[in-house]
Amino acid sequence: MNWLNALPHQIPFRAASSVIDRSEKSIRGKFLWTANETMPAQIMMVEAMAQFAGGLVFEAQGFISGIDNCEITRAIEPGDVVIVHVSVDADFGRIFRFSGTASIDGVEVARGRFYLASSDAQT
């Protein structure tokens, strides 16, 4: 099953649009920021990282349980294609720690560390 289709998020809160590449411990994908979005772009960059991270480690749904050291250095403009890269830093059973970056045209515009928790006993 395509995990992107299994995400419970719908437009305008669905940030993950396509996977560029994926390994066991990291994933890189993208989302397109449009002028019609209702959510602030800064929130969506962090949300995109979390959505891709969830697809990397969970078969069932998970949720953001913490955000650390998140830094956004540039705003997203309508039409920007944001490339997201997320890696698993630690596995604590039902909680995972990730590091993520977001870039536009090869320039990093956001980075952060965050935690996702499984909403199911199976991950």
Predicted segment positions?
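Hydrophobic alpha-helical segments with strong N-terminal bias
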Residues: N2, P8, F52-A53, F58
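Short, functionally important structural connectors and interaction interfaces within domains
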Residues: W3-N5, G62, D68, T101
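Compact, glycine-rich, soluble single-domain proteins
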Residues: T34-L56
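Non-catalytic linker/capping segments at the edges of enzyme domains
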Residues: M1-M39, T73-E77, D89-R97, I104-V107, ...
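NTP/phosphate- and nucleic-acid-binding module
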Residues: V86
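Hydrophobic beta-strand-centered segment that forms part of the acyl-chain substrate-binding groove
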Residues: A53-I83
